[in-house]
A protein has these predicted regions:
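Aromatic-anchored transmembrane helix interface
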Residues: 1-20, 28-34, 38-41
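A membrane-periplasm/extracellular boundary helix in multi-pass inner-membrane enzymes
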Residues: 42-51, 118, 136-178, 194-198
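Long extracytoplasmic/lumenal interhelical loops at the membrane interface
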Residues: 176-240
Length: 337
């Protein structure tokens, strides 16, 4: 119940913001998270000193993630993943017709890129680049109506194959063979094997069950820190079972794209799927599916984008003809007479 309540508050907050501010909600949300991240950066400096903080940050950026000291404090998981969503939006979908819109777009894009990079979630950076490229390739193309829901259906099939590979250690062996440091994820995933089965009759253990068994493993000394699975696809399957997992993924990956395609247009559907696709990469290796701000941003950006695209045209105000227009009109009438 707590998870449902938590997620409901995030989604309802996004709806309320869009209801109050319409298309301005994205800009206000961006400003607020930039201010929040800046405040965290400034408040963390006294603990390390200015020179050491700058050196730590530069080292993290140059080495692509060797975070220590001050830079480690800036690895603000929820906010960093949200900045990835905002980078995707401003790079591909933000309005850029007028000069003012172009300036605003570039200003926010640079800010979001900066905060996204200093958060240094290495799995998220290539994911953002991938879906920026996909968005740029598809945003002006007319595709069949069945394509985006079909992509969502393929994602669900991929998740089931992914779970099979996780359970049988295929993912772990593959990544270890190419030298990828899984940072203990493979061990956590193997510990979970006795608690679920890949079967259509598996009904799950209920919400928060994974947190319970993680606590038990920690108390038993099996793990050093009570971290979740770092695999939200596995977590949802263990807790909700096969039917619940199909419901959870079907709503997000099939029904929601169908809704946006019917209510709005293909470009809105593409925005939602690009944002969701980026977040899906993090679902596979992290605990982001139920982060408060990530959940809010995923809904808020698409909702506010719809408000921008569905704005009624500005009413035309009658203006009298100019002196030159009147002369031209009289000349035409005289020629016709």
């Amino acid at each position: 119940c707590s998870k449902l309540l938590f997620q409901s508050i995030a989604i309802l907050t996004a709806i309320a913001l869009v209801y109050l501010f319409r298309e301005k909600a994205i800009e206000l949300f961006t400003i607020s998270i930039c201010i929040t991240n800046t405040a965290i950066m400034l408040l963390s400096i006294p603990g390390y000193g200015l020179a050491a903080s700058i050196q730590s940050l530069v080292t993290c950026l140059v080495t692509f993630g060797e975070a220590d000291g001050y830079a480690l404090q800036l690895e603000i998981h929820d906010l960093t993943f949200v900045f990835g969503q905002m980078v995707l939006y401003y790079a591909v979908f933000a309005p850029h017709t007028t000069r003012q819109e172009k300036r605003k777009r570039w200003r926010y894009l640079l800010l979001c890129c900066w905060f996204f990079l200093i958060g240094m979630k290495r799995s998220a950076i290539p994911a953002v680049l991938l879906f920026v490229l996909i968005g740029l390739l598809l945003r002006k193309r007319k595709v069949p109506d069945w394509l985006y829901p079909a992509v969502g259906g393929c994602c669900i099939l991929f998740f089931l194959a992914f779970l099979y590979c996780v359970r049988n250690g295929i993912i772990s062996r593959l990544l270890n063979s190419v030298g990828v440091d899984m940072m203990g994820r493979d061990y956590l995933w193997s510990l979970a094997n006795p608690y679920y089965e890949l079967s259509i009759t598996y009904l799950g253990h209920g919400f928060e069950y994974v947190d319970t068994i993680i606590g038990q493993w920690y108390d038993a000394g099996l793990i050093n820190q009570a971290f979740p699975f770092h695999n939200d696809i596995l977590k949802v399957f263990v807790e909700m079972g096969f039917p619940g997992f199909l419901l959870w993924s079907g709503i997000q990956y099939v029904l929601t794209p169908l809704f946006w395609q019917h209510y709005a247009d293909q470009q809105t559907t593409l925005l939602y799927l690009c944002e969701l696709g980026y977040m899906t990469v993090t679902y596979l290796t992290d605990n982001t599916a139920f982060y408060f701000w990530s959940t809010m941003a995923l809904r808020l950006v698409t909702l506010a984008y719809v408000m921008e695209r569905k704005k009624p045209p500005e009413p035309k105000v009658w203006m009298p003809d100019s002196r030159q227009e009147m002369r031209d009109r009289i000349r035409i009438l005289m020629q016709e007479g």
